[in-house]
């Protein structure tokens, strides 16, 4: 349910459970975390999904069985944030719930026009993963973060772009090409220089 393609310093992870809107199981989260933790030599990392949805969040059956409070979510986002190369979320469709943590942990987020963004954690009776509100607030500010997490608002791709939650809106056929193009300079650069710039950017 997870595919990994590695080519010349670029690691591309694809969530590959389109029949379930790429809903994340514990096994998928564990595999994703292991890949991200192993990506210390990756010069670029792209995360995308198969089908028309990036991810619907956690698998509903597993969420009620304890996945909602699993440490795997935080382990995954921490591992993505620690990747030394440029990390890009290429959002091929809607991004919902706990899957938001993956995108927030990336350096750059690109999305298709039909993507929607929502995080209904409060409605379902759970707290978000600890780093998610902090990363979201750093991008869009506390008030807009509360609009999503507490107000239950669903954003369109254009609203997400205006808020600063994503950096570009692209047609589906251009999404991965643009992600690869953005990563190409970092892949070609000196690793030390790339790491230095990444550190200076915060």
Residue ranges and their predicted role:
Residues 1-50:
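Conserved CoA-thioester-binding segment of acyl-CoA-metabolizing enzymes
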Residues 30, 34, 41, 49-82, ...:
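Glycine- (often His-adjacent) and acidic-residue-rich active-site loop
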Residues 44, 93, 108, 147, ...:
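Well-ordered beta-strand positions
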Residues 134-143:
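Hydrophobic, secondary-structure "cap" segments at the distal end of domains
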Residues 110-115, 166-202:
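C-terminal long alpha-helix characteristic of the crotonase
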Residues 79-124:
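Glycine-rich beta-to-alpha active-site loop
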Residues 74, 97, 127-130, 154:
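Glycine-rich phosphate-binding loop at the start of an alpha helix
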Residues 13, 47, 59, 102-104, ...:
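Hydrophobic/aromatic residues within transmembrane alpha-helices
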């Amino acid at each position: 349910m997870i595919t990994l393609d590695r080519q010349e310093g670029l690691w591309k992870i694809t969530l590959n459970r389109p029949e379930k809107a790429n809903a994340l199981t514990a096994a998928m989260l564990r595999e994703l975390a292991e890949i991200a933790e192993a990506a210390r030599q990756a010069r670029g990392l792209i995360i995308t999904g198969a089908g028309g949805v990036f991810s619907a969040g956690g698998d509903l059956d597993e969420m009620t069985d304890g996945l909602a409070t699993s440490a795997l979510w935080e382990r995954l986002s921490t591992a993505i944030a620690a990747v030394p190369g440029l990390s890009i979320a290429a959002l091929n469709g809607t991004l919902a719930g706990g899957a938001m943590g993956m995108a927030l942990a990336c350096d750059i987020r690109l999305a298709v026009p039909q993507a929607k963004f929502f995080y209904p954690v409060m409605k379902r009776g759970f707290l978000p993963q600890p780093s998610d509100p902090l990363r979201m607030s750093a991008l869009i500010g506390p008030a807009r973060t509360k609009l999503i997490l507490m107000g239950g608002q669903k954003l369109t791709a254009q609203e997400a772009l205006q808020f600063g939650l994503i950096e570009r809106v692209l047609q589906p056929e251009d999404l991965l090409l643009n992600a690869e193009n953005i990563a190409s300079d970092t892949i070609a650069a000196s690793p030390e220089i790339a790491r230095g710039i990444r550190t200076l950017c915060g």
